[in-house]
Each structure stands twice: as structure tokens, then as C-alpha cells.
Amino acid sequence: MSEEVGAKRWYAVHTYSGYENKVKKNLEKRVESMNMTEQIFRVVIPEEEETQVKDGKAKKLVKKTFPGYVLVELIMTDESWYVVRNTPGVTGFVGSAGAGSKPNPLLPEEVRFILKQMGLKEKTIDVELDVGEQVRIQSGPFANQIGEVQEIEADKFKLTVLVDMFGRETPVEVEFDQIEKL
């Protein structure tokens, strides 16, 4: 599987059971204090509201969908991996195959399903672009490159941009929030 460097993805993080809220708070504080807001974006505890009827009274409870897990939206770099991995209460990333190895991201369909169940939405970005328009890539390995939009995949929030590399036009896949229309 070819993982695009610099792409924003969702990862599952394993925590001590019952520490999900603490991990979320700790991680959000660490992101701010360590200036990681450009690499670590959202921390979500998968939970859903449940109504229980007890003694004839309806009571709403918030139940954790996946106890012991927190979802983190980030760009996987050595720094972001280190910050999350070393947050108090975190035992590790789900999907990493051993010491020091980087984890696999969650599939976009899985994330959409979980967020939809919670009543949240994946960030939607309204970009009015057409094939052939000029854009500037703002982040990632091709930051500050100017290119021409070749293909738009609205359902995946991605587009293919032709950039000039070493005198040749090269297609580069980027996310909507990584570009700026010229």
C-alpha cells in the first residue's frame, strides 16, 4: 500500500480502559504546547447516546462505542507519532507491527461510519475548482508548487495536480485542504 507522505489521515490509538477522556485532554494540551496544530488536528472519543428507562423514567447515557480507544486525525510524521505515542495513558497505535513501526491509517469508509454514528461529520471542504485551473499546493512535500488541476475526486476530497518537476509535468495527488486556488 503506497501511503502518501504528508496526507491527513485518521488513526486508532489504544488507551488504558477508562482513560479515554484523560488521553483526549492530555493530547489536546500537548498539541497546543508543542506547536503541533499543523500536524495533529482532531482527537475524538467514539461514543453514542443511549436512552435507558429505569423506574419509568427515561435517562440519556453516553456510552463509549470502542472502550479503550481514541481516534486521532493527523499527518503521520516522526514528530506527530512521538507526541501521540508518548501521551500519558496511551499504550500505542492500533495497526503498528512492532517497536518503532508506523501504524496503518483507518479506511475513510470506517471513519465516515464512526463519525456519522456519533452525529459528527468528516470535515467537508467547499472548493470550487475545474479541471485546467491553476492552484498552489500549501502543505506537504510539494508545498509552494504551482500546478494545473488534472482530475477532481470530490468523494475522496482529493485532486490530481500536474506540477513541473525537473522539467517534466508530474501528477501529484493532494487533498482539497492542501491547495489554494490562484
From Swiss-Prot:
One of its GO terms (cellular component) is cytosol. Residues 131-163 form the KOW domain. InterPro entries: KOW (IPR005824), NGN (IPR047050), NGN-like_dom (IPR006645), NGN_dom_sf (IPR036735), NusG-like (IPR043425), Rib_uL2_dom2 (IPR014722), Transcrpt_antiterm_NusG (IPR001062), Transcrpt_antiterm_NusG_bac_CS (IPR015869). GO terms for biological process: DNA-templated transcription termination; regulation of DNA-templated transcription elongation; transcription antitermination; transcription elongation-coupled chromatin remodeling. It comes from the Bacteria. The keyword Transcription applies. Keywords: Transcription, Transcription antitermination, Transcription regulation, Transcription termination. NCBIfam families: nusG (TIGR00922). Belongs to the NusG family. PANTHER family: RHO-INTERACTING TRANSCRIPTION TERMINATION FACTOR NUSG, TRANSCRIPTION TERMINATION_ANTITERMINATION PROTEIN NUSG. Participates in transcription elongation, termination and antitermination. This is Transcription termination/antitermination protein NusG. It comes from Staphylococcus epidermidis (strain ATCC 35984 / DSM 28319 / BCRC 17069 / CCUG 31568 / BM 3577 / RP62A). The gene is nusG.
